[in-house]
Amino acid sequence: MAIRLEKSGDQHRINLEKGASISGEININLDWSKGGFLKQMFGGAVDLDLGCFYELNDGTKNLIDGLQFSHGRGGNRHQVSRQGSYDQKPYIWHQGDDRGSGAASGETILVNPIGVNDIKRMVIYTFIYEGAAKWADTNAVVKVKVPGNEDVIVEMGQQNNNKKFCAIAELIFGGDNSITVRKLVTFHDGHSDCDRQYGWGFRYSPGSKD
């Protein structure tokens, strides 16, 4: 069984005190259709990148995605880097950039449950790094998986927006071992445009993964 958030604004509260959830990894996964072999070989497949804005209760704010930890700026889950950290603050770590490899599992961000009362909020987003905004071809789905709870599923649906950046979901950490997942699915011109809508206040400069 799973909880599906159908419309923008729909939300579901997860209680981390249920079952084994307080000791298991919180898994935020983006999966999408990468097309058949020929699409991957000749460049017709759409490659998505998963990322997040996050804010801690101590006021720390940052963002994590493949652009941020490219050029050797990432690290393993035990280190603190532009890829985040699982063992230390922010207790949020991106597993790595898929780069269109065709892997069935897509991209994943892990949240350490020992840090849930240190985290205030996250906005989960995806963007198309290269190519046209063919959202309808992606069948993109975000799943929030907490052991001992039903998965919370946010589907993008058949979108035809020509903007290449999409805020998919917001996670609100209640400070009481709870997480509320809210569906967004709003489209933006890029990181800075999304930042303005959701009030993060970062400054941006052009970047690349290559």
Residue ranges and their predicted role:
Residues M1-R121, Y125-D210:
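Intrinsic-disorder/low-complexity signal
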